[in-house]
Amino acid sequence: MTDTRYDALQQLGRESRMPDSPEAAVLERVAAPSRGKNYVVRFTCPEFTSLCPITGQPDFAHVVIDYIPDSWIVESKSLKLYLGSFRNHGAFHEACTLMIAERLVDLLAPRWLRIGAYWYPRGGIPIDVFWQTGAPPEGAYLPDQGVPPYRGRG
């Protein structure tokens, strides 16, 4: 059975190659199934990668995105390809994290969004970057992001 509401999607159900850059990646959205309810959608990307803009060395992060939809939800295959497009993108941790959050906010206009990017150590120092659009709506169930602080071998 084909649902014509999804015919405009360019990637879901089709062979898609990894975009060359985040700017070239196409993020897609579909209508939210339940408007007016404070339900949280969570995406976890435990193997996010990008490149240091200075050295070109790989950086790795565990990224958790939580949002409360309004009219739209992100199509998950397009999000997977978007996040994968950072693999050859050179930017500092903070820039990558905020670029992801801002692109999703622009696309979805969610009721609320937060991102936690838990970057693995480079030079012995882990960098964690957090951002959210504001206070979450009252009554929303927001589980902890579930990523323990980095401890190394200790």
Curated annotation (Swiss-Prot):
Alphabetical GO biological process terms: queuosine biosynthetic process; tRNA modification
Record Pfam families: QueF
Binding residues for substrate: V74, E75, S76, H93, E94
Disulfide bond annotation, renumbered to this chain: none
Active site feature: C52, D59
Family note: Belongs to the GTP cyclohydrolase I family. QueF type 1 subfamily.
Record-given protein name: NADPH-dependent 7-cyano-7-deazaguanine reductase
Organism per entry: Acidiphilium cryptum (strain JF-5)
Gene this chain is encoded by: queF
